[in-house]
From Swiss-Prot:
GO cellular component terms, A-Z: extracellular space; secretory granule
Signal peptide range in chain numbering: 1-25
GO biological process, one term: neuropeptide signaling pathway
PANTHER family, per the entry: PRO-OPIOMELANOCORTIN
MF terms in GO: G protein-coupled receptor binding; hormone activity
Pyrrolidone carboxylic acid: residues bearing it: Q26
Residues bearing the modification Valine amide: V152
Chain residues in the propeptide: 104-137
Keywords linked to the UniProt accession: Amidation, Cleavage on pair of basic residues, Endorphin, Glycoprotein, Hormone, Pyrrolidone carboxylic acid, Secreted, Signal
Gene that this polypeptide is encoded by: pomc-a
Name of the featured protein: Pro-opiomelanocortin A
Length: 259
């Protein structure tokens, strides 16, 4: 039972010794390890052995996430994303501009070389303006289906017409004292008695000249006599047969009493 375990252990130990001896033979065979009489020669030989070991041994990830990736690796990693490019800090091209590789590939076509690029002079300004325009477009699109989508100016109050001819003005344009005075004038306007008396005299004179004022513009302005007071009072002609009936009745009664 112990023999197979010892056999495996010896095989592993032999492989390790053979590998170390091969590395040491490579270090000794290099030209840097030829002169080992001085300290500088020994240090150079040690450096050569370290480089050989690092080249053959596997590289484990250490602080690799802190180091910037190369452009080819970035392109390969980001191709499966929808936005397919890095931000400003990571997407520096060969010419130092803050544009992604996708735009660089498009600009490399010979057709675009015929037209001068106006955005090369100020790339930073265009990058800042693009998100603002995009936000405005999104806002306009989202508010189109509402009836208040577009901002409306200040609403105008309807003008109220009063019988005295005074239009209501905005109360905000007057201070408190003027508001009170204006309200008093609207509620109790000042009246000159002399002018009113003269106006009444003129109106009475006009009515005397034209005769009695009747409401001709209404259908009940001058109703016929037979329909006045709801038809209870009939004209004089209709009252004569009734009087004769009364007379006849009285005469008959007197004759009966006399008999």
């Amino acid at each position: 039972m112990f023999r197979p375990l010892w056999g495996c252990f010896l095989a592993i130990l032999g492989i390790c010794i053979f590998h170390i001896g091969e590395v040491q033979s490579q270090c000794w065979e290099s030209s840097r390890c030829a002169d080992l009489s001085s300290e500088d020669g020994v240090l150079e030989c040690i450096k050569a052995c370290k480089t050989d070991l690092s080249a053959e041994s596997p590289v484990f990830p250490g602080n690799g996430h802190l180091q910037p990736l190369s452009e080819s690796i970035r392109k390969y990693v980001m191709t499966h994303f929808r936005w397919n490019k890095f931000g400003r800090r990571n997407s520096t091209g060969n010419d130092g501009s803050n544009t992604g590789y996708k735009r660089e590939d498009i600009s490399s076509y010979p057709v675009f070389s015929l037209f001068p690029l106006s955005d090369q002079n100020a790339p930073g300004d265009n990058m800042e303006e693009e998100p603002l325009d995009r936000q405005e477009n999104k806002r306009a699109y989202s508010m189109e289906h509402f009836r208040w989508g577009k901002p409306v100016g200040r609403k105008r109050r309807p003008i109220k017409v009063y019988p005295n001819g005074v239009e209501e003005e905005s109360a905000e344009s007057y201070p408190m004292e003027l508001r009170r005075e204006l309200s008093l004038e609207l509620d109790y306007p000042e009246i000159d008695l002399d002018e009113d008396i003269e106006d009444n005299e003129v109106e009475s004179a006009l009515t005397k000249k034209n005769g009695n004022y009747r409401m001709h513009h209404f259908r009940w302005g001058s109703p016929p006599k037979d329909k006045r007071y709801g038809g209870f009072m009939t004209p004089e002609r209709s009252q004569t047969p009734l009087m004769t009936l009364f007379k006849n009745a009285i005469i008959k009664n007197s004759h009966k009493k006399g008999q």
